[in-house]
Amino acid sequence: MLSLTEIRAKAQSWLGKEYNEETRKEVREMLDKDEKKLVDAFYQDLEFGTGGLRGIMGAGTNRMNIYTLGMATQGLSNYIIQQCGNSGVKVAIAHDCRNNSRYFAETTANIFSANGFEVYLFESLRPTPELSFAIRHFKCQSGVVITASHNPPEYNGYKAYWNDGGQVVAPHDEEIITEVRKITSVNKIKFNGNKDNIKSIGKETDELFLNEVKKISINPEIIKKFASIPIVYTPIHGTGITLVPAALKMFGFKNIIGVPEQDIPDGNFPTVKSPNPEEPDALKLAIKKAVESNAELVMATDPDADRLGLAVKNRTGEFILLNGNQTAVILIWYILSQFKERKKYKGNEYIIKTIVTTDLLEKIADGFNVEYFNVLTGFKFFAELIRQYEDVKKYIGGGEESYGFLPGDYVRDKDAVASCALAAETATWAKSKGMSLFELLLDIYVKYGFYKEKLINIVRKGKEGADQIKAMMAGYRNNPPEKINNSKVIKINDYEMQVSLDILKGTKTRIDLVKSDVLQFFLADGTKISIRPSGTEPKIKFYFSVNTKLDCSDKFEETEKVLDQRISAIIDDMKLL
């Protein structure tokens, strides 16, 4: 780590004329008055990783600002020029509702245009999946979205995409990182944009995108019968407001109820602790509105509208939140069952899930004789696989436990706009059968097995914390448990070593995925435990999945208690809490 003298010298280099007055003023104040803030802003460089940039906004090398963003964009530009020259290169840019997102998007556009690229810049905030669509529609070589997903208000970020509309993957990701690291001075950034190279896009692109979304509808005639089903939707101050209500209307829904306090885009997210549809607090106002209006479904999207949270009525009429696994299960079952009912199968269809997502999706796919693939966490791996099989197989849906879902191949990133529309359609289909979405979920459990998942995060901050996380992973890897909660470990998947060990057979097979620091333990009782360090935060994640038979939906509550107790016993046995 840098000494305080080195940090001060690094900060003083930001007082030069190449930095704007606002930046110089902020740095001077830190140098004069706030040593702690100064150290945090300059002790390291904000790293351009495989997912791009994400950090707290402000002056400094460890902050999101036009200079760190500029270095990333110039490095990406240099890589694009290496790959295909700068003649005829097109790029697309979108941004979310966050503070400075528009400013950062315009700065990115200026740098791309100064490098000779034709730039398609959305006129205002838009959902991330529409950026993926724009890259594909305009035949762009690359694209960028300015967003920090559901991080706190002080954060912003920068995600880079490639010409298929997916986030960059190997070999491009590491090669772009190499180019970004070569930009060692802000003087190497071409800030002076060429306005002739920047084209504003908006409503026409929205319509083209929504037309593709509409194609995923399977039962439009059922929606006509139940068009007035009351649905509450909240964008949680984010970009979803620009397209989700329009998508629902395009599908035929006529009774979409908003949450006025949250319909206004606001990077401060004033009505919630966190704009994360996984959090009950984020849906509190929407559920209140649903109770008042006797709505049947509540939907929420995160700030860049690529993740979806649902709340449905349970058997006593109380709204409960579905987790990402449950939403994926309902949507995949609906797609597969309706493909079968309408005789749409051609025999080459497949679905995708991540390795930490519920294996109930595999059971459902097997039940419909549909192929499934497991990929590492992150939708960039979905995009990579879809591209790989583009000419021979048909992707029809896929999801991950972290609330991302993509119901078609028209874009190559998770899409909460289309997922909201599909969830609403699924609710009308269930209603046509005399069921709620919750009752449909219970029916799925009865038929395929009751799977219950839980995620716990253990936070370990700073260098000491990072060392502890490494030691924990090394401990599980080098001395794996033989039993967990009195159930034998029968298989271990080590994605870092790319090896699957079948303990019962004593055989090893290769895991054909890129290396990733993930371990999985499969137990004799059907339990799956996945362990991985977070790629973006100082924590280690433990994913637990247990399952059992559900004899009938009336036994749901008592069976759920049994599964909850099993998860608690596993956590106790592993001494995690």
Language model feature labels by segment:
Residues 92-155, 254-309:
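N-terminal small/polar loop signature for handling phosphorylated ligands or for N-terminal nucleophile
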